[in-house]
Amino acid sequence: MKTLNRRDFPGASYPERIIQFGEGNFLRAFVDWQVDLLNEHTDLNAGVVIVRPIESTFPPSLSTQDGLYTTIIRGLNEKGEAVSDARLIRSVNREISVYDNYDEFLKLAHNPDMRFVFSNTTEAGISYHAGDAFDDAPAVSYPAKLTRLLFERYTCFDGALDKGWIIIPCELIDYNGEALRELVLRYAQEWNLSAAFVQWLDQANTFCSTLVDRIVTGYPRDEVTQLEAELGYHDAFLDTAEHFYLFVIQGPKKVASELRLDKYPLNVLIVDDIKPYKERKVAILNGAHTALVPVAFQAGLDTVGEAMNDRDICAFVEKAIYEEIIPVLDLPRDELMSFASAVTGRFQNPYIKHQLLSIALNGMTKFRTRILPQLLAGQQVSGVLPARLTFALAALTAFYRGERRGETYPLQDDAHWIERYQQLWHQHSDGLISTQDLVHAVLAVDAHWGQNLTHVAGLVEQVTTDLDAILTKGMREAVKPLC
């Protein structure tokens, strides 16, 4: 069986116009996949050079396959049908290591056609590294590497204003473009680079903040033999992802036309402020996950897919989204409804086995950031506690017993919470404290919740009622009235 390469698998190739920091699965199934579609359907005509930003030889370089690889996009489509689509990606030209080929890295700035910089260097990537110097070959941090490359660009083209870049980071931090810009300016100042360069940074370059959303499951290790037999070639860089994707870019409208989104619309939004879209994702997608996990797991289920195929649990989650989360969010209702519909479809994806226990990681913090704002807003708007979000808090409290049907399971959270729950549940089982005492102790920790939740009218009482129902009837019976 032949391995992918451009000689044996000839096809379109594109001039290099995009620099991409990061060689991982996510960018290849998200950015490079979208660029490939735009190349096919518009005159974007943009090839990608991947820059490996870390000193590592694993995985091997994508250049071993001449930049070619296959994405397999699978999940439920808009009609709820299971679909699987294999696509040979031709948008990537090559990969270079900034550690092994530093001069080649700097030469990227000499190409007059270079226009875009994308990156995903993990959440820790957009950070300051003390000691990074201009003459390092390379500097350690991504922002320092980018600063050096931008200075090379500025110098090569004598500060021409039409030779700046549109810089679009995809790292999962708030306002990632603004954070990256601040660090580039910090290094420029620290390295005593000219005021003219700093002015060029500001006038010629656009730093965009983003929200990225797609579950990328990467290399399908357990299915490789079957998939390669279907494809008819060997691909060491197979990349699988869900059908859904969303790319929100905070930036000027010209970004849409430069990416040719006006000629072939993808699920990419160019917006003035990313904040409401982040709130939507956190509240609906992440919030539904967080509400679902303790309820579904204690009902005897193990994966998100199993939960969404369970009539009662699915109804509980959907009612939480549509009746309690969406009404308190500040975005057009049709956008929220459309996003919510996509979320429930994503949860039902038969190709993704999403373990509930893995999502349960750091559940206390997740509840505070993802559900509590909607719970409190719902009470303020209607004067009534949202029944399902409140029940989810009771279910979370029960989850931290660490036992299901007589078997223990691992709890992954801050040591403080694990120890505190262990103490409280022991006292409860020994009859030393009541259920209400236990609930009061959990809700009173204002250092965690940001306020003392025992002061929220009726919350202690309702969580206690729900928790008692879970303890006496079991999760299935306790949740039924809310389904």
From Swiss-Prot:
Its EC number is 1.1.1.58. GO terms for molecular function: mannitol-1-phosphate 5-dehydrogenase activity; tagaturonate reductase activity. The keyword Oxidoreductase applies. GO terms for biological process: D-galacturonate catabolic process; mannitol catabolic process. NAD(+) binds at residues 18-29. Pathway: Carbohydrate metabolism; pentose and glucuronate interconversion. This is Altronate oxidoreductase. Keywords: NAD, Oxidoreductase. It comes from the Bacteria. One of its GO terms (cellular component) is cytosol. It comes from Citrobacter koseri (strain ATCC BAA-895 / CDC 4225-83 / SGSC4696).
